[in-house]
């Protein structure tokens, strides 16, 4: 099966929302080889495929992408991020690059995919993979976005979660709150401003809020 070097997004939630798109690639006869932030390697470990980190250091990242283009049996690159920089890195890395026509990068894409209308990010990533497969002359294995993300956990992930639950005496009913999105999107603040207001109502119905703030 031909290998496609897939550039993952830079955030945990977005990486998870790529999973149906990656499953579509695999089901359609392609082998996804993943490239992304180093922390994503552990997140995607359950997929069992190749992962190579990029760290935001231009010369090192470019050397790694060129090495992969020459030695990982791949000439195709698929971009899930919208950024100009992600497209430029793959292009300079000598990959045939496919991605959305965003961030004024159309001229460096080998296969530019028209932007879809407003949709959930899961559907947007799925659309990217679906259109890419067709641009490569293949037929997508399915056209409907799966209902579940289906993140595959390793035994060590489950053990680590169990240890945290025991260490911090987390009750059986809990909700994870992750107020980490920053910046603006289309002129609007991305982060939800009401996490503090959500804590008390959750506790009132017997659900303990567990907050995972950003480290940065």
Which residues fall in each region the model found?
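Catalytic machinery of carbohydrate-active enzymes
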Residues: 1-216
């Amino acid at each position: 099966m031909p290998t496609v070097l897939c550039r993952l997004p830079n955030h945990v939630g977005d990486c998870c929302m790529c999973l149906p798109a990656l499953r579509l690639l695999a089901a359609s006869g392609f082998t996804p080889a993943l490239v992304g932030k180093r922390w994503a390697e552990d997140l995607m470990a359950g997929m069992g495929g190749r992962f190579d980190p990029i760290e935001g250091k231009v010369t090192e990242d470019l050397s790694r992408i060129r090495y992969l283009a020459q030695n990982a049996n791949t000439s195709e690159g698929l971009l899930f991020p919208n950024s100009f920089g992600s497209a430029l890195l793959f292009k300079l890395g000598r990959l045939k690059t496919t991605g959305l026509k965003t961030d004024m990068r159309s001229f460096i894409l080998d296969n530019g995919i028209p932007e879809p209308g407003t949709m959930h990010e899961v559907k947007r990533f799925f659309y990217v993979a679906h259109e890419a497969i067709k641009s490569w002359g293949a037929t997508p294995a399915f056209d409907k976005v799966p209902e579940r993300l289906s993140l595959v956990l390793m035994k060590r992930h489950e053990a680590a979660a169990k240890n945290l639950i025991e260490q911090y005496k987390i009750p059986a009913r809990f909700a994870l709150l992750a107020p980490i999105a920053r910046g603006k999107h289309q002129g609007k603040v991305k982060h939800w401003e009401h996490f503090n207001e959500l804590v008390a109502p959750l506790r009132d119905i017997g659900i303990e809020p567990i907050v995972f703030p950003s480290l940065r």
